[in-house]
Every structure is written in C-alpha cells, then in structure tokens.
Design a protein with these regions (language model features):
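Secretory targeting and sorting signals
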Residues: 1-29
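Serine/threonine-rich, low-complexity linker/repeat segments that form flexible spacers/stalks
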Residues: 18, 25-48, 178-233, 242-245, ...
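Low-complexity, serine/threonine/proline/glycine-rich extracellular segments that form mucin-like
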Residues: 46-87, 91-99, 223-261
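Solvent-exposed residues in well-ordered beta-strands and their adjoining turns
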Residues: 57, 225-227, 246, 290, ...
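Extracellular adhesion/glycan-binding regions together with long Ser/Thr-
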Residues: 92-167, 262-325
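Long amphipathic alpha-helical scaffold segments
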Residues: 135-145, 162-202
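Serine/threonine-enriched low-complexity regions used as flexible
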Residues: 156-186, 222, 235-237, 302-352
Length: 374
C-alpha cells in the first residue's frame, strides 16, 4: 500500500536530517540494514572541521514497506532513546514515539535549512536533549581541501553527530541530526549530506586620518557582526567588543564621543550595553553587549537551563565609533588600534570563550574565526 498522507512533522524531521519525504509506520515495514553507511558534513571553511572530533548515537532506523514502485519510508526509533524522545515529545503511549509523531496532524518537530538553523526550536531542542547519549567516538575522513568530513557509521538511519572539540580557530558546533543516504526506486529520501552549520566571525577597523596633528582628534570605527547565540544558555552569555592602543600611544580617548549601533540602531549606554575604560587616562576599553542580546534573544525571565530562541539579532552589523585626541607625535603612520571581539564558543559552557583579534594594519578585516549554529 502506498500512503498518500505525508504529515508536516514527517517532512520537517526529514528536512532537518537531510531526508526527503517519509511517512507513518506500518506493520510490514522492513528495517534497512544494507547499502550506504556514510554521512558527510560540508563546511565553507577548513577551520570549521580541522582539529574537531565527534561522537555519535543512532536515533532511528529506516523502515521501508510496500512493494515497488509504491514503497514508502518511515523512521523507527532506537530502543535506547525511546524514553527520552517520548518524554520530549510528550508522548504517553507504548508505541514508537517518532512513528506516533509522524501521524499527528500538528507537527511535533520542525525544519530549518538556513542560518541560524533554529526553526521554531523543537528539533533543536530534541538534538540538545539527546546530545549526552552520543558516546561513540567516530573518525572522519577529510576531503575537498578539508571542507568536507565523511563519517562511516555502523548502519543506515538517522544519526546524531556531536562535536567534541573547541579549537583556536573555530567553536564547538551544536548537535547535528543527519540521515545516511537512502535511495529507493530512484527516489532520494536522504542525501547523506548536511551543512556543518558554522559561521565566520571577524572584526575590522578604519581610521579617518592616520596623521592627525597634536591637539586634534582622530576618528576610529570598529565593525563586526553579532555571533550566532541561538542554542546557547542565556544565563552567563557574554559578547564584548574591545579596543586597545599601545601603553605609550600619544592618544587620549575623548569622552562623550563613543557611539554603538546594532543594525543601524544607536544603543543606549547603561541600558543596552556597558562600557569600561573609555576615559582620558586609559588605553583600552570594553563594550559589553550581553544585556542587549539577552533582551532581544530571549523572552521572559531565564532559568538555569534557558537557551536563546529568538534569532533576530544573529548576523546583524555592530558598529563602534569614537574619537581620540592626539597628545604627541604620531609620525607618518599614525597610531594603530587593535579591536577584539569575545563570545562563548561552546554551547554547553558559556565560560569557554573565543577571542577574535582585529587586524594589525589600519584598515583590514581580521583573520576569521568560526562559530556555531545547528
């Protein structure tokens, strides 16, 4: 029999996992045990994969039922995860929780194919819920200039891939649900390929005049973007932008000239952000934008395990402008500033931070650093 009703939830979890259309389970379904057993993670930068290690857990098998050419596919939950998945889906029956979810008119899981890969948060929540179950270490084979990582797994099905490493050049990714490649009767149900879902962070700067005379003001601009905070814990989250001159630089920050904008909206000091060190005797200052991100990225009062669910600020432009008065000779090259951004690089631990330094020359972007999404 060919099922014609493909529920929204079925399509949703399929899309998230790299699967095509799937349908509700049937008594005569047969678990797929042969064929493809690989999943490939795709990255835009080698830094997203180089140095990373992974652990996995199988979430569900593929069940194929019916006769050619009217075969259909469903997901069969692995026994060891049934209790956790049923609890997450609020399923109180005794059957297969994913099979039950696939038969509901109202989707129980969602899809998201673009950054920051949140959707309505239901599938993101399931991946986070199961992350601790991924205890099997798996080795990947890197290819395509280290921008692809291919895993050979034990059997076909839906797998959860959990990044274990934080490197100096990239952050730890959120848990990733992915399906091994599956093709039946020339129909591709799963591509076996999915994005690593990291993004690239950088900070750049400009100076309006590099050879300002003593007693005059030099204008500086720092630009960066809000990193992907979705899936990170709200409590303890911190995103800062800082700038620094050499300790003997002949410059003095000019009070009341600091201006901070996000997405072309000027923010209010003391309310949207805090700033320390921006005074005439300092050579460095730090702007903390954490309060603004928390206000925009999470609704309500967070508890210990609350995570960001609103992605409106992700990737928005951040601009910092200020003036500094020249107090001595700056020579023919002016005085270079060194901006830095700092943010958590491990979704499970806000204490682990990534620092991205700005360029050493006067008007270049910094070396990029990668940060997650899923």
């Amino acid at each position: 029999m060919k099922l014609t009703k493909i529920t929204a939830m079925a399509a949703a979890i399929a899309t998230v996992a790299g699967l095509g259309a799937v349908a509700a389970s049937s008594a005569n379904a047969q678990v797929v045990t042969d064929g493809e057993k690989t999943i490939t993670l795709n990255a835009t930068s080698a830094d997203q994969l180089t140095g990373h290690t992974f652990k996995v857990v199988k979430v569900a098998s593929y069940d194929v039922y019916g006769t050619a050419p009217n075969q259909s596919v469903t997901l069969k939950t692995e026994d060891g995860l049934k209790t956790d998945i049923a609890k997450y889906l609020k399923y109180t029956g005794t059957g297969d929780p994913l099979a039950w979810a696939q038969q509901q008119d109202q989707a129980k899981l969602d899809k998201s194919t673009t950054s920051p890969w949140l959707g309505d948060g239901t599938t993101r929540g399931l991946a986070d819920k199961l992350a601790s179950k991924a205890t099997t270490t798996v080795t990947s084979t890197l290819s395509n200039e280290n921008k692809q990582a291919t895993f050979t797994l034990d059997s076909p099905g839906l797998w959860l891939i959990v990044d274990q490493a934080v490197t100096g050049k990239s952050s730890k990714a959120l848990p990733i649900l992915a399906g091994i490649k599956l093709t039946i009767n020339n129909t591709v149900y799963s591509s076996g390929s999915i994005d690593m879902k990291n993004q690239t962070a950088s900070v750049s700067k400009t100076v309006t005049d590099q050879t300002v005379a003593a007693g005059q003001d030099a204008s500086y601009t720092i630009t960066t973007k809000v990193p992907n905070y979705v899936g990170y814990k709200v409590n303890g989250y911190q995103f800062t932008v800082s700038d620094k001159f050499a300790h003997n630089a002949p410059l003095s920050y000019k009070t009341d000239t600091l201006k901070v904008t996000v997405d072309n909206k000027q923010l209010t000091a003391g309310t949207d952000y805090t700033v320390t060190g921006f005074n005439s005797t300092s050579k460095t200052f730090i702007i903390d934008l954490s309060a603004y991100i928390k206000a925009k990225g999470f609704k309500g009062t967070p508890v210990d395990d609350s995570k960001f669910t609103d992605a409106d600020l992700v990737g928005k432009n951040v601009t910092v402008e200020y003036k500094a008065t020249v107090t001595g000779s700056t020579g023919n090259t002016g005085v270079a500033n060194t901006p830095t951004i700092r943010y958590p690089n491990d979704p499970s631990n806000n204490e682990s931070k990534q620092e991205v330094p700005g360029p050493r020359s006067r008007s270049e972007p910094s070396p990029s650093r990668d940060f997650h999404g899923s």
